[in-house]
Amino acid sequence: MASSQGKNELKLADWMATLPESMHSIPLTNLAIPGSHDSFSFYIDEASPVGPEQPETVQNFVSVFGTVAKKLMRKWLATQTMNFTGQLGAGIRYFDLRISTKPRDPDNELYFAHGLFSAKVNEGLEEINAFLTDHHKEVVFLDFNHFYGMQKYHHEKLVQMLKDIYGNKMCPAIFAQEVSLKYLWEKDYQVLVFYHSPVALEVPFLWPGQMMPAPWANTTDPEKLIQFLQASITERRKKGSFFISQVVLTPKASTVVKGVASGLRETITERALPAMMQWVRTQKPGESGINIVTADFVELGDFISTVIKLNYVFDEGEANT
């Protein structure tokens, strides 16, 4: 068993740097890593237009009810309260990123988006980079998994932005099982960029999206979610990729209508938290266990420290198999 020394005194901002030496050579695919769902949604611009991915019914709802509709949408679209710096300082190392252009934007600016628009992408990436510069042994996963209204030019712009901001901090795509903290530290790499677009095949530092699978339960029922999470882990491929367990409940339209004024956090997340956290506590990382675990409102229920502490109690033999 890995040593439990220090696990009760976690330095969350530097938790990777302070892992026991025995874990430095373990593939990152076999560690437990906390992440956030819709990581950028702590800021949603109610003055912005509705995102282009939203169905016509939502577009019409907003066109009729305007700002009131957007305020209600925000209660259900905002899945985080901490900004990137806050999440990083609290221990989050995986970021779920969705990128969009704005209709008729002459500047062709790129924004984070989930229903409504969030901050400019370059601002968020710079914020993450500032943390990495101050914490040179911490490693982040940037998962660009949805693109809305983006043409070839926009992808080229985003790729150049990543180069300009992160430069040599980015780890080129290799076999996932070769990536350990030791490997990354030796080469001064701190950023793994996953890109769910064919563009990834053309750029050495973009990891193909299929190397970061994230099965989605799409349910409001905590019991069904836990069954789904357990089944997904059981089916996890033995080698070859990272793996995300989304400990996330997804509201149905009827759920939103019933709790329209209270929002996602109060209506769903907080009520289901005990059951979801109990599942997390019983997991272990390793080839046939969890890897990256994501959640809404990551500050709730000691989620982050609970995931990190799993690294101190798992069977080292299995992790190195």
UniProtKB/Swiss-Prot annotation:
GO terms, biological process: lipid catabolic process; signal transduction
Cellular-component GO terms for this entry: cytoplasm; synapse
Domain PI-PLC X-box residue range list: 22-197
SUPFAM superfamilies according to UniProt: PLC-like phosphodiesterases
Catalytic site: 37, 114
Subcellular location(s) per record: Cytoplasm
Tissues showing expression: Expressed at highest levels in heart. Also detected in kidney, lung, small intestine and colon. Expressed at very low levels, if any, in leukocytes, thymus and skeletal muscle.
Gene3D superfamilies documented for this protein: Phosphatidylinositol (PI) phosphodiesterase
Organism: Homo sapiens (Human)
Protein name as it appears in the record: PI-PLC X domain-containing protein 3
InterPro entries with a match to the protein in the record: PI-PLC_domain (IPR051057), PLC-like_Pdiesterase_TIM-brl (IPR017946), PLCXD1/2/3 (IPR042158), PLipase_C_PInositol-sp_X_dom (IPR000909)
Keyword terms of this UniProt record: Cytoplasm, Hydrolase, Lipid degradation, Lipid metabolism, Transducer
Entry keyword Cytoplasm: yes
Principal location listed in the UniProt entry: cytoplasm
GO MF annotations, alphabetized: phosphoric diester hydrolase activity
